[in-house]
Amino acid sequence: MIRAFDAFSLPLLRLLDAEDAHRLAIQGLRLLPQVKPRPDDSKLAVRAFGLNFPNPVGIAAGFDKNAEAPDALLRLGFGFVEIGTVTPKPQAGNPRPRLFRLERDEAIINRMGFNNDGAEAVLRRLAARAQQGGIVGVNVGANKDSTDRVADYVSLIETFAPVASYFTVNVSSPNTPGLRNLQQAAALDDLLARVIEARERVRASAGDTPVLLKIAPDLTLSELDDVVHIARSRRVDGMIVANTTLSRSPMLRERTRLNEQGGLSGRPLFRLSTRMVAETYVRAEGAFPLIGVGGIDSGGAALTKIRAGASLVQLYSALIYKGLGLVDSIKADLASTLLRTGRDSLSEIVGADAPTITAEEWPV
């Protein structure tokens, strides 16, 4: 079914504006038959953040911003889905065009600006599917016009705690002016303290929902030192490494798009984000697991992220170029690697290459 969907949809979607194609893809997923997914190889199961993931391959925030198709995505074989970014109030985001394909680089530039339906609408959808099971995380952010951005995060934690499998505190999008300033030490410490306090306030009624922090790949190593130290001291449950980058590699072939503002994702982000995974893994010293994201487009790329220090991985941009069949392909490659090397689980290789990667010259 997935192969047929890809064969039909990928050529068609390439003919459309990138954002229109994305909208059509979400609508198409909602129309797919409710086919029960094949069981995953038990060796791919991952225990992280107090949750049991059937496999390590998730879909990153940004694809299903408004929780319109989480169950369809789970049925397609993802081990978990992250919806959002959600803000307290609905917002339109930045003016179009704001999403651009770099086809020769298998990359995307976006400056979406947290366009979403707002907390009330997204909560209603998640509450309606609450009995469906599966791990569905909620990525939360601040409204562009907010006068108290920390209060936005706190309100979202309190609102979504009953329906979120986990939270991702997104302070790393480059498309909301000033948002990345929340990664600075004093601001981040205050934010995480208040977010964790909010989680504790609703613990009795909503449970102990894990809180993850998503960071930018553009941090310096000194800044990363501070971020990881604060994350550990505030006892966050994990980190997602990393968001899109503002950097533009001179190796990019799609030169006509180099001046487009926004975050770059896809294959050109792979090396930088993998280095950041390894650097974060070394600094975390086992305090919490990591989700690796950025440029994963094959089983080999997923394995590299895991060996750099990621317990789980997320995809998005590669799906635009390779289709939804990529999910099963990555899982099959990971299972084959475990079988070939005689290992019982992916946890045995998490971070195996981190010392080697971090010894390389910086910046990459």
Swiss-Prot record:
UniProt xrefs under PROSITE patterns: DHODEHASE_1, DHODEHASE_2
Pfam families: DHO_dh
Annotated binding of FMN, by residue: 61-65, 85, 139, 170, 214, 242, 266, 295, 316-317
Compartment list: Cell membrane
Active site: residue positions: 173
Alphabetical list of InterPro entries matching this protein: Aldolase_TIM, DHO_dehydrogenase, Dihydroorotate_DH_2, Dihydroorotate_DH_cat, Dihydroorotate_DH_CS
Enzyme Commission number(s) of this protein: 1.3.5.2
HAMAP family named in the record: DHO_dh_type2
Family: Belongs to the dihydroorotate dehydrogenase family. Type 2 subfamily.
Protein name, entry field: Dihydroorotate dehydrogenase (quinone)
Organism name: Rhodopseudomonas palustris (strain HaA2)
Gene responsible for this protein: pyrD
